[in-house]
């Protein structure tokens, strides 16, 4: 974990700094990283406004989503809110038997439950697994999320299992996977295009901006004044992932999937 984190920090530092100084070949850095970890690294960087691909590596290959799927999940929830099919203020109750091993926020509210908004906040900002599973139950489970993604034009991303099983990340298993290209394009649709209302787009970005888990990755190497809204993921077999919206001057300019 520590070695992979240091490699990612080095990669992201090289990617972010060029915007302010001398360009660096990101692909060369990624290939060097692959040689070091004896594994694959998928990467896509696109322009936030146009969706144009700025740089990529293995962008069409499948990689496990792990907890990064929680951004897509909350995007699906917000679409239902926009359509009047869900309310962020609706309270969902549960009991101790519903709790996953990693439930930092939901474990504190067994008595009173949590609202849909609070569950989305918990799923994204602390990666609370129980929050994610409770939210999945409101949209038809993993199949429901996959169906939603197909409706946005994403024909690659798929969710097949609940937390924590989806983090198995077994090599060659296509369950619970996406491609860097598909994830980046879907994020661009959710965060900048008309899939969500402006109010819901801002809500989703605000949850990502409050991420309390991704500090050691992007946030620790960003130049001063840059904005970031992100979500990280970790799974078995050394799998790690991050999706992020970031840019200089406090304004979003690119989407990165790694």
Where do the language-model regions lie?
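Mid-domain, small-residue-enriched loop/turn segments at the edges of structured enzyme/sensor domains
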Residues: 40, 120, 133-192
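Conserved catalytic neighborhood of penicillin-recognizing serine enzymes
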Residues: 99-134, 142
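Short, Gly/Ser/Thr-enriched beta-strand-loop segments that form substrate-interacting elements
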Residues: 215-258
């Amino acid at each position: 974990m520590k070695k992979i984190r240091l490699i990612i920090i080095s990669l992201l530092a090289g990617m972010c700094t060029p915007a302010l100084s001398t360009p660096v070949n990101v692909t060369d850095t990624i290939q060097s990283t692959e040689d070091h970890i004896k594994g694959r690294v998928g990467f896509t960087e696109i322009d936030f406004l146009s969706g144009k691909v700025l740089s990529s590596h293995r962008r069409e290959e499948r990689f496990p989503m792990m907890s990064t799927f929680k951004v897509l999940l909350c995007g699906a929830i917000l679409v239902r809110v926009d359509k009047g099919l869900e309310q962020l203020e609706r309270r969902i109750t549960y009991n101790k038997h519903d709790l996953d091993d990693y439930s930092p926020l939901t474990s504190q509210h067994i008595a009173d439950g949590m609202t849909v908004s609070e569950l989305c906040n918990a799923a994204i900002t602390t990666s609370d697994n129980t929050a994610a599973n409770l939210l999945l139950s409101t949209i038809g489970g993993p199949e429901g999320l996959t169906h939603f993604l197909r409706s946005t034009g994403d024909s690659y991303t798929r969710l097949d299992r609940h937390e924590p099983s989806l983090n198995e990340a077994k090599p060659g298993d296509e369950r619970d996977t996406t491609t860097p290209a598909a994830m980046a394009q879907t994020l661009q649709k959710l965060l900048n295009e008309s899939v969500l209302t402006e109010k819901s787009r801002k809500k989703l970005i605000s949850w990502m901006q409050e991420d309390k888990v991704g500090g050691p990755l992007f946030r620790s190497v960003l130049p001063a004044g840059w904005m970031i809204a992100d979500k990280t993921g970790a799974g078995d077999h050394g799998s790690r992932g991050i999706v992020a919206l970031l840019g200089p001057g406090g304004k979003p300019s690119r989407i990165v999937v790694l």
